[in-house]
């Protein structure tokens, strides 16, 4: 993502949905001025300790007032929900300085499956991104274009992501005794297997 951003040292980067601050940490190490937004107080507390040199905030992306050289959003778009796609892209458009670049990483669904998919609620919409919606590539491009944004490139990493999911499962199973001790039951365990 940093390579695709083509950011230079000391440029400003807004991260919409900074999560546990993995990207922010790398970006700060590269000399970028990072502002990260999250809606999770727990994530914010963790991230602020992990990356004290980043400006991390408990803030909704829609409340962004500043402009940035670049914007990054990593697997947050899926949680936005289709009715909010115009607001999401409008916020990116108004928050980018002229000539700025945004990199949005999103899980997508095939174009030929999108029309049927959007009629119902699947596992991801029910349990992972409640109220969210995976975009198809063409739906993503169209929503961005309506707000004056242009998609200049795409990168698919399905095989890499399959490995990521496999590693998450191994880590989940290894930590299951600790997770269970927090009060989560076998139904929860099966849900994420």
Regions from the PLM with identified roles:
Residues 9-17:
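Conserved class I S-adenosyl-L-methionine
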Residues 20-31:
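Conserved SAM-binding loop of SAM-dependent methyltransferases across substrates and taxa
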Residues 47-48:
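Conserved SAM-binding loop
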Residues 51-61:
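Conserved SAM-binding strand-loop segment of SAM-dependent methyltransferases
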Residues 62-71:
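A short acidic, Gly/Pro-enriched loop at the edge of an enzyme's catalytic core
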Residues 86-98:
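A short glycine-rich, Lys/Arg-flanked "PGG" loop and its adjoining helix->strand segment in the class I
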Residues 99-106:
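Conserved beta-strand signature within the Rossmann-like core of class I S-adenosyl-L-methionine
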Residues 108-193:
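Substrate-binding/catalytic lobe of Class I Rossmann-like enzymes that use SAM or dcSAM, i.e.
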